[in-house]
């Protein structure tokens, strides 16, 4: 989901999960989360809301690099994906306000790799003010694995506006 501020991305997602009662983890990203290490920890803890044992190997790992090398990033997303692969519970991971960390290479690198190896029982929803520039998005779109909601999808039609004010 990508659209400007105030278009209702977060509200629409919250309403969807309330209505469907589907299992989900929700990570509301803040400006302070623009470092890969806290980002991964917060992501793991958000998933633990659905799967309490998730991420033990990541949290036990001695992650202390301020500027991790590609080998460390590869190890982290491998551990993360391995932990996702053993989850039997279907659920959705929501990353809300992703635009706040979209400029961080390490976060984009890890998220793009996670998307590539995401098990079929787990969905990932990104809510952002801008469309991420990941190369994997084109592949997903061509394979019919990407649902993209844009700003126009959040705008009311004239009929919807009329119904809104009549109710």
Explain the meaning of each model-derived region:
Residues 2, 95, 128:
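Short beta-strand/turn micro-motifs composed of small residues
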Residues 57-94, 101, 112-118:
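Mid-core helix/loop region of P-loop NTP-binding domains shared across ATPases and GTPases
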Residues 1-28, 41-45, 131:
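P-loop NTPase Walker A phosphate-binding motif
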Residues 37-60, 81:
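Conserved NTP-binding/hydrolysis module of P-loop NTPases
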Residues 2-5, 25-35, 60-66, 151-152:
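A short hydrophobic beta-strand->loop->alpha-helix junction that borders the nucleotide-binding pocket
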Residues 11-15, 92, 105-167:
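Alpha-helical sensor/transducer elements of the RecA-like P-loop NTPase core
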Residues 32-33, 99-103:
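Short acidic, S/G/P-rich loop/turn micro-motifs used as interaction or catalytic elements
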């Amino acid at each position: 989901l990508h659209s400007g501020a105030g278009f209702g991305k977060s509200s629409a997602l919250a309403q969807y999960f309330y209505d469907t009662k589907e299992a989900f983890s929700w990570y509301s990203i803040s400006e302070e989360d623009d470092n890969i290490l806290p980002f991964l920890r917060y992501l793991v803890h958000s998933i633990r809301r659905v799967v309490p044992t998730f991420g033990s190997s990541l949290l036990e790992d001695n992650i202390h690099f301020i500027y991790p090398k590609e080998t460390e990033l590869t190890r982290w997303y491998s551990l993360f994906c391995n932990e996702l692969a053993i989850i039997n519970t279907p659920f959705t991971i929501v990353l809300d306000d992703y635009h706040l960390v979209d400029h961080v290479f390490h976060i984009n690198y890890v998220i793009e790799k996670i998307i590539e190896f995401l098990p079929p029982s787990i969905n990932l929803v990104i809510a952002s003010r801008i469309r991420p520039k990941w190369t994997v998005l084109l592949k997903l779109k061509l394979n019919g694995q990407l649902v993209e909601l844009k700003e126009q999808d959040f705008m009311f039609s004239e009929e919807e506006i009329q119904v809104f004010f009549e109710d």
